Amino acid sequence: MALRSFCSADGSDPLWDWNVTWHTSNPDFTKCFQNTVLTWVPCFYLWSCFPLYFFYLSRHDRGYIQMTHLNKTKTALGFFLWIICWADLFYSFWERSQGVLRAPVLLVSPTLLGITMLLATFLIQLERRKGVQSSGIMLTFWLVALLCALAILRSKIISALKKDAHVDVFRDSTFYLYFTLVLVQLVLSCFSDCSPLFSETVHDRNPCPESSASFLSRITFWWITGMMVHGYRQPLESSDLWSLNKEDTSEEVVPVLVNNWKKECDKSRKQPVRIVYAPPKDPSKPKGSSQLDVNEEVEALIVKSPHKDREPSLFKVLYKTFGPYFLMSFLYKALHDLMMFAGPKILELIINFVNDREAPDWQGYFYTALLFVSACLQTLALHQYFHICFVSGMRIKTAVVGAVYRKALLITNAARKSSTVGEIVNLMSVDAQRFMDLATYINMIWSAPLQVILALYFLWLSLGPSVLAGVAVMILMVPLNAVMAMKTKTYQVAHMKSKDNRIKLMNEILNGIKVLKLYAWELAFQDKVMSIRQEELKVLKKSAYLAAVGTFTWVCTPFLVALSTFAVFVTVDERNILDAKKAFVSLALFNILRFPLNILPMVISSIVQASVSLKRLRIFLSHEELEPDSIERRSIKSGEGNSITVKNATFTWARGEPPTLNGITFSIPEGALVAVVGQVGCGKSSLLSALLAEMDKVEGHVTLKGSVAYVPQQAWIQNDSLRENILFGHPLQENYYKAVMEACALLPDLEILPSGDRTEIGEKGVNLSGGQKQRVSLARAVYSNSDIYLFDDPLSAVDAHVGKHIFEKVVGPMGLLKNKTRILVTHGISYLPQVDVIIVMSGGKISEMGSYQELLDRDGAFAEFLRTYANAEQDLASEDDSVSGSGKESKPVENGMLVTDTVGKHLQRHLSNSSSHSGDTSQQHSSIAELQKAGAKEETWKLMEADKAQTGQVQLSVYWNYMKAIGLFITFLSIFLFLCNHVSALASNYWLSLWTDDPPVVNGTQANRNFRLSVYGALGILQGAAIFGYSMAVSIGGIFASRRLHLDLLYNVLRSPMSFFERTPSGNLVNRFSKELDTVDSMIPQVIKMFMGSLFSVIGAVIIILLATPIAAVIIPPLGLVYFFVQRFYVASSRQLKRLESVSRSPVYSHFNETLLGVSVIRAFEEQERFIHQSDLKVDENQKAYYPSIVANRWLAVRLECVGNCIVLFAALFAVISRHSLSAGLVGLSVSYSLQITAYLNWLVRMSSEMETNIVAVERLKEYSETEKEAPWQIQETAPPSTWPHSGRVEFRDYCLRYREDLDLVLKHINVTIEGGEKVGIVGRTGAGKSSLTLGLFRINESAEGEIIIDGVNIAKIGLHNLRFKITIIPQDPVLFSGSLRMNLDPFSQYSDEEVWMALELAHLKGFVSALPDKLNHECAEGGENLSVGQRQLVCLARALLRKTKILVLDEATAAVDLETDNLIQSTIRTQFEDCTVLTIAHRLNTIMDYTRVIVLDKGEVRECGAPSELLQQRGIFYSMAKDAGLV
């Protein structure tokens, strides 16, 4: 009564009246309902949102938006609406003053509405000030207000049309005005305002339109339509991609994760410590001393907490970093889940409506509209949820990749050994992807149980306790699923381990491919890879069987639940009739149940995979980091005299291992030149590493003053232009740059590079000779203009002439660096008289230290060494005056030896070999003009081929290739089993509709109940058998395909010529063997199953709808056309985006690989931040392609679900229209199938697109499986006899060589005959073509003209392995592979242990190997990093001694060893290869002075040839080189 008196003065107006609103053919709301509920609903909505929204806006300030016409209009309309509401209020007061009694509601409602309009106007301005361009809150408010007003408007129009109707002119007029203004506000809210002032998007040339899109555009993903149209018209390119939103960039995302991880690590380390007793501090002890007195150590009794340090939780860190944004997805998911159950409830109402012939028609249309609206709301909620999940996943991946990269720059060398390059690449590719995938599913952990509980609740309402039978079936399945999840985790760990090992091995193979080819070891390593792959495939096969059982249980569970529930329902009580309402509402609920039951195991599997990845990532991120603070760095401005001070320092490579350097103490004054000498493995390089803080300092104190530059023993070259390699992030200073180029003898090289210093010099410098690479490395250091220079034997890779030039111009007392502090590790003795201090290393300790003269006077080990190995002509007495003390100018010593060293991996003598350095350094001055000319060239010459994206539709041949890889029988068997499964599913549901239409007999039971139930069960069993069959077939077929495609790729890559590896960045190949192969292994079989399932489900649903309502044939074809068009529209762009994403992924890995190889150089130059920035840019470039692809997915899904919702609408509408001619069973069947079709359509396009985007992996594997191949390895017809070559006679006949078709000749018309057993030296300036000659001999590069004849056999006519097994090389780069030492010597296990030990003894390694705990089984690290360069060179000598072929080639083989070891090696070669033909490329001429002949090469031509003594008499090139080396 109170409410009635509130609504009307006489109390006659109720709030609700069923007869007015429902039981009528012309429904309406009561006046009270209109004035209260319909007026208050929008007010309550806005006031309930206001507190949270105000808080959100106060925390998210995006900038200030200037007042625009749009904003002014919205504000003005807000005020007008307020005025209208208050006009109504004042009118009511006026009426009261006139004695007209009005209901209180006419005072309350306008007041409430007026205040709400003021709030709306306030929010419009607040949003503008906070930079909100389009508001969802406000648009929803105006929409709700309009819908409520629409109901009132309809009522007013109806009442106005009635005869004798009372019209309230003022209130009706204000209402019509109110309605119009609300409509205009709604329309205006659909548009977006301009960007805030100073917004980053204003300056961005290609900003993402999302940030400026309207709310409607954002929820429907309309803002990406422009890109979709562009992609449909022509293939998308990287230039078409938008910039990332600021909040998605690495710059924003990575630091937050890294900082949170650091905090978590600090927390986990903090443990309560209680000091029971601590001795008083000794005041005499120096402050900050790191030495703890032994007695003190004993006295300090510390009782620690008994708990160990807990592991830091990476999950907690990820949640803290990304949780707040991700939590929004909870709301959308909850809304979607609740809306999902509206479908079955409305279906129930529709079936009731069809059964009730008396119900008015408008109710049927109302239910249909309700079904459509609920489906549309469900669509919008679901895809906002997915969007948040995918964006969260993307951010997690970006953060993980960034964190891994940053960590890789910090970890210790010991940690580097425990995490190989392959493992770290997997962390960035596979593991980061696992987190990304999990972000999509993680909400299902709470959502799936919620859906199951709600479904069971509604089923209970429909079928009663019979539902417990279905629950029992589900409970029975739980332990089975749990067991499978545990097994999946086990297999996942095993799979990842095998994959890591395979990627690690492939990395090594790709890094050492040249050595494999020279030794003809490809087959041995192919077998190694295949054995790992076999293990991987075994695990995959077990996983596939598990997946088949899983699919069987997951797909069958909903049917078994339905069958058991229906069976119990009809059998427990004969009067329980399974009518259409019970059956199809239950079936709709069972269909809802199907999804959480299917998805839960997948979620569990995804969580299992992610937990494995989480652990791997946590272990990596928890690795020990280098402690740069262990070395004290001081400013150059600090007044102390010494540049480097080391006091009693002990260093080790890994904690817990014996120290490598012991008790090191020395001081170096500013500007001094210090040489470090000693035998192989004595700790010279380790000393430099210790100064760079690359080693673990056990004790002692080290101080460095100023910045440091470092030139490593193995030159590290970036895949960039020559100029960028030298500048290394510093700005270009033209004059200084030219001076550095001249000093480092690089000017002549610019003449022969296609674009001068802008020429791209390839990954790891593959188109430079060893000497050129080292000079680029040296120039980088010199250009950095640092205070301290650490040189690790840089002069060894160049010939004597260039070495002398570099020493004089750069390192020496008169060089560019004369005022800098320089530490030079060297094996040469010719420069020692000119240095200020010599440090002699022995066994990790400093054995002697002093100036050259002091060490001679001391007559110790150094003096003895000099007397033994200095050139006989050297007059030591004459050198007294030339010894340089501190600050004295020294005169270069002409005689002495220079030990050469060739450094860097994969030395490819490319263009450089077509020219050489001129003999006269004065000519280099004239080459400044060449530098300027080269710099002026606009086009940079490219060596590396970037990973290219294919365009257009994926070729049918790619699908056909995949089908062939699976096997045609398995392919067609799978399709047949899919068909059987879906036919039996359709039949069982149609059978159910017939069952529900069975009329009950007189006693209230159904006559054919048992028969119907038996057939229904039989059809279910048939369905289950088909499911198990196709799951098994697809899984096994997928493994067949994986095996075949990997084998083809591996087979082809190993048979590719060297030119292929020079052009192709290793990142591209690693990407194929890791990410693309993982897609083929794991993704494609799953996608095939889901695609086939979706396709048949859609076809089945359409058939059922057409059977039930044939009139639907009118609407299905047009909707089908819309669907097809949208799908093609999408796939065109999606496919290209996937390709662009794949292509942009390779540079991330390439850059990462490059960084790991040069990490010590990057750290030495303190360039970590620049490299991190470059990595972030590459990751962002990759995400720029990924982000539009996930949005395109949502764009498609929203549009497709709208098509699906239209099918639901028309199926229900036609059922309502035809209700008098349709049975309830058919209506139920038709509408329940139409409810599913939305999901089916969505999945079908998603899966067809996933199919096409994932099959791109097959296309990319195929791309590298069909590249050019080198000549056959074995040719039976022309194979030489086993005794060949018998004498070792080598004949070059008019031989010419070029590296590629488009390049000039590097060897020109060589005509030389070398008799069997001859010892021939090959000499020439750096880049003269010496190594090119050996490449031609091994057919690494095929001849352009002419031929090489060995013992009468033209080598071009025989197989490559026939040739390469019969000749041996000790190459420039001593490459070792991870594995046992024995495997590195004899990968085919052809020789006995005795023979291997003999080879090691002759190579002077027996003592070293015998001292190792595992002897021959000693495990070599990746790249042989746990051996010194000299030891690696000796291992290569041992390989040659094992093979003992008739022809031996030494390519500067003793470069990295000390003079004493070199002498032993030379005598070994002379005695062991006495009857062999030996070709030696030498920079150190004294090693070939006793050879029978010397060939002098210059610019690819033979300039001189004859005995060394003859050539010296000729006074030509050889004479000038010998003079430079101090031999004449």
Curated annotation (Swiss-Prot):
What reaction does this enzyme carry out catalytically? ATP + H2O + xenobioticSide 1 = ADP + phosphate + xenobioticSide 2; an S-substituted glutathione(in) + ATP + H2O = an S-substituted glutathione(out) + ADP + phosphate + H(+); leukotriene C4(in) + ATP + H2O = leukotriene C4(out) + ADP + phosphate + H(+); sphing-4-enine 1-phosphate(in) + ATP + H2O = sphing-4-enine 1-phosphate(out) + ADP + phosphate + H(+)
Which of UniProt's keywords are assigned here?
A: ATP-binding, Cell membrane, Glycoprotein, Hydrolase, Lipid transport, Membrane, Nucleotide-binding, Phosphoprotein, Repeat, Translocase, Transmembrane, Transmembrane helix, Transport
Give a GO molecular function annotation for the protein.
ABC-type transporter activity
| Annotated stretches, region: Disordered | 876-895, 909-929
Gene3D superfamilies per the UniProt record, alphabetical:
ABC transporter type 1, transmembrane domain, P-loop containing nucleotide triphosphate hydrolases
Known regulation of its activity is: MK 571 inhibits sphingosine 1-phosphate and leukotriene C4 export.
Its source organism is Mus musculus (Mouse)
Q: Could you tell me which residues carry Phosphoserine?
A: 290, 878, 882, 912, 927
**Its Enzyme Commission number?**
7.6.2.2, 7.6.2.3
Q: How does it sit in the membrane?
A: Multi-pass membrane protein
For the biological process aspect of GO, one term held by this record is: export across plasma membrane
**Localisation:** Cell membrane; Basolateral cell membrane
Q: Which protein is depicted? A: Multidrug resistance-associated protein 1
ABC transmembrane type-1 domain: which residues? 326-609, 971-1253
> Which CDD domains does its entry note?
ABC_6TM_MRP1_2_3_6_D1_like (cd18595), ABC_6TM_MRP1_2_3_6_D2_like (cd18603), ABCC_MRP_domain1 (cd03250), ABCC_MRP_domain2 (cd03244)
